[in-house]
Amino acid sequence: KSVWQQYTATAEKYNDPGRFTAMIGYEWTSVPGGNNLHRNVLFRDGKDKADQVFPFSSWQSEDPEKLWAWMDQYETRTGGRLLAIPHNGNLSNGRMFELTDFSGQPLTRDYAERRARWEVLQEIVQTKGNSETHPTLAPNDEFAGDMGIAGWEYGNLTLEDKPESPEMRPTMYLRAGLLRGLEQEAKLGVNPFKFGLVGGTDVHNSLTAIEEDNYFGKHVNQEPSPHRWNHVSKQGFGKTRYTWHYLAAGYAAVWATENTREAIWDAMKRKEVYGTTGTRLTVRFFGGYDYQPADLNSRNFAWAGYQKGVPMGGDLTKAPAGK
C-alpha cells in the first residue's frame, strides 16, 4: 500500500460534505538551479479517482509542461479534474513569468492555452514572503515591499546560482506578471498569465496557526522557542535567511456555493477567490455597467451582482455605448 493511498484514505476519512472539506492534493516541487517553480496540484475528486494514478514528481521532470501533460492524462483516464497553483514567484529568479518555455524557446499560442487552462490561480503571499510586487517595480506605491520582502530578495529559493537582480523582477512578481500576460495576449491571441489570487501558508507542520502571536513556523525546527528568531534557514551570496524573515501568512478565501470538494474546486477554477495575509476578511465585489445605488442596500447583494454583472475573477467586457 503506497503512501499516496494512505494519504488519500486520510482525506477521505475526514471529508464531511457540508461541514468540513478535506481536499486531495500534493506539491510538485520543481526547483531548477534553485529557482522556485513549485505548484500545488488540487483534485476536484475523491479517493476513487485519485488512487488511479500516482502523483507526477519533479524527480520525473522539472518542466511545468510535463506536469500539465500528466494532468491532462489524469483527466482523460479518470474523468476527474485538476488545477495547479504556482507559488513563490518571488523566489524564482525571474522564471515564474519568463517569456520563454522551460527549454528557452519563445512562448507559443499552444503553450499559452495550456498554461491558461491548468494554472488559473497564483499564490500572492505565504510564509516565504510576498510575491505581489517589489519597490523597484512600483516606486510610487508606498505599500510595495511593506511586508514580505526582507530576506527573500537575496536570491532564489536555495540561494544558489546567482543573486536576485532588478532585471529579473518583471518576470517574477505577480503584478508585473499580469502585465506580461496582456502583452502576450496581444501577440499570441491568448493570455498565459490570466490568474486569480489566493494566499497560503506553505508550512510543513500541518498547522494553520498563522496569527503573529500563535505562529508555529514552517518546519519543526522553527516552532516557538526563545531563540527561534535567529535560526539559520539558508545561506548564500554572503547573506543569511533567518526564521524572523518568515511570515505568519496567509489564507485562501473561496466564494463557493457549498462546503464540498466540488463546489470549492469549481469556485477556484472560475477564480472567485482572494487571498489575505491571515486576517479573516470578508471581501466580495462584482463588476458591470447596470448597477444602481439601491443594489448596495439589497438584502441579496450577490443576486444583483450576478444578474447585472460578473463576479470577482470574471471577464468584464468593453462597456456598451454611453456607459
PLM features: residue spans?
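C-terminal functional module detector
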Residues: 8-11, 30-33, 75-82, 88-323
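A metal-dependent hydrolase metal-coordination microenvironment
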Residues: 1-100
